[in-house]
Amino acid sequence: MKVDILSREYPPKVYGGAGVHAEELSKVLAERVDVTVRAFDGPRAENEIPEIPGDNPKGSLKVVGYDVPKELQEANGALKTFGVDLQIADDVDADIIHAHTWYACLAGYLAKMLHGTPLVITAHSLEPFRPWKREQLGGGYDLSSWAERDAYEHADRVIAVSAGMREDILSAYPNLDPDKVVVVHNGITMSQFETPSDDDPGWKVFERYNIDRNKPTLLFVGRITRQKGLPY
């Protein structure tokens, strides 16, 4: 089986959680199937492609990067995105398309129509719940919202990373068939989250902020952005 993962972000060009998600998903899938990641920000060098975990992977991992067409270098940000999406849609060659974020959703939807390939979308955020983006994109926000809505409403499956996200998806896009929206929680690689030894220098953070390391600690990890809901 061949899977094309479409993503705005992919190593080494990662600035948010969606990029981390796409990287980790691609590595795990590549243990089992042939994966091609189609991402923004231009070609990747061979040494920038993540290694497939495991001793005997049955699949493969390939990364194809795309640049904004030179004719659109000075265009609105949404139009730059669409310029990359058109290139990706033309190149898709897979049994399943898996798109992430609105940046790549239009490419997935166009490829679905062009090639007849089933489209899966993972929701990391939703344009209707980020109205402040109009400050950044102007009328381009209407374009990004349109692209996301059309892609979601025509996807064969939409993955929500939580029950709350599923509710938001159905609220934002009431025309979407609820049976197509499923919850798949984010996972972690447990070996990367082992409790450090007592002499690990990382414990100095607890000392610096006077945190009792013997008590449970609630930690938030995320970008400082309005959509995260932190009022400080």
Label each residue range with its predicted role:
Residues 1-53:
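N-terminal subdomain of nucleotide-sugar transferases
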Residues 4, 212-228:
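Conserved donor-binding/catalytic core segment of Leloir-type glycosyltransferases
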Residues 55-92, 135-136:
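A short, charged, and often flexible helix/loop element on the N-terminal side
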Residues 97-98, 153-163:
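A short beta-strand/loop micro-motif in the catalytic core of glycosyltransferases
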Residues 99-104, 123:
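Short His-centered aromatic/hydrophobic patch
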Residues 117-120, 128-150, 167:
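Nucleotide-sugar donor phosphate/pyrophosphate-binding loop at the beta->alpha transition
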Residues 164, 187:
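Carbohydrate-associated surface elements
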Residues 194-211:
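A short helix/loop element that forms part of the nucleotide-sugar donor recognition site in Leloir-type
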